[in-house]
Regions:
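N-terminal active-site segment of His-dependent metallophosphoesterases
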Residues: 1-35
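Active-site neighborhood of phospho(di)ester-bond hydrolases with catalytic His/Asp-centered motifs
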Residues: 20-24, 47-51, 113, 155-162, ...
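Short, well-ordered beta-strand micro-motif
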Residues: 102, 112-114, 188-192
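Short, solvent-exposed loop/turn segments at secondary-structure junctions
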Residues: 28, 53-54, 116-120, 163-165, ...
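A short acidic-Thr-Gly-centered motif at the start of a beta-strand
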Residues: 12-13, 37-40, 101-106, 148-150, ...
Length: 192
């Protein structure tokens, strides 16, 4: 959260005129989980569902948080009851949040998802495997091995999830998760 606000200030981000779209995993990465979740209440911040938000929702639904906790969700039990209630309410909003966001400018179409768009051709509203949208590393791993293919239907796809040393582009896919939690390197892609 603090790192994000510092970087946004350096980028001259204006909450009055700009919009920040997150590729998910807004939790389980540092100590300011609730503060980051509170950004969901601002008009300038939106997010797709990431696999960490999905793990939290699954923990709430099944009453078994072990998988989430070992993947960073332990913070949830370390906050006050009042803060836990607020975090729960904010996390539950991810039931209604999109897994995929499309942004169209006057000249380009961008698609934002957490891990992948699991098809070779994008179409708005097309049914795709949500587990792959949240978890798949196959396309990026294939690209790293030289098996690079564009996804039709949009100009640019922006993904997080799999950590890369620096913002990495293969065909029309951009990977921006530069492990800010450990490296302090928080990456952005400016659409307009």
């Amino acid at each position: 959260y603090s790192l994000l606000l510092t970087r946004l200030a350096k980028l001259n981000f204006s909450p009055d005129t700009d919009l920040l779209i997150s590729t998910g995993d807004n939790i389980d990465r540092g100590k300011e989980n609730l503060e980051t979740l509170r950004l969901l209440n601002t008009p300038w911040f939106i997010s797709v569902v990431g696999n960490h938000e999905a793990m939290a929702l699954d923990a709430f639904e099944t009453q078994d948080g072990n998988f989430w906790y070992v993947n960073g969700g332990y913070w949830y039990d370390s906050v006050t009851e009042k803060d836990r209630q607020e975090a729960t309410e904010l996390l539950l909003t991810f039931k209604q949040r999109p897994h995929i966001i499309e942004v169209e400018t006057s000249s380009k179409k961008y698609v934002i998802a957490h891990a992948d768009y699991p098809d070779d051709s994008y179409d708005y509203g097309k049914q795709v495997d949500i587990d792959s949208v949240l978890w798949s590393r196959d396309r990026l791993l294939g690209s790293l091995q030289g098996n690079i293919h564009p996804i039709r239907g949009a100009d640019t796809f922006i993904f997080g999830h799999m950590i890369v040393d620096y913002t990495t582009t293969f065909a029309n896919q951009i990977y921006i998760d530069t492990d800010s939690f450990c490296s302090g390197n928080l990456s952005f892609f400016k659409i307009k």
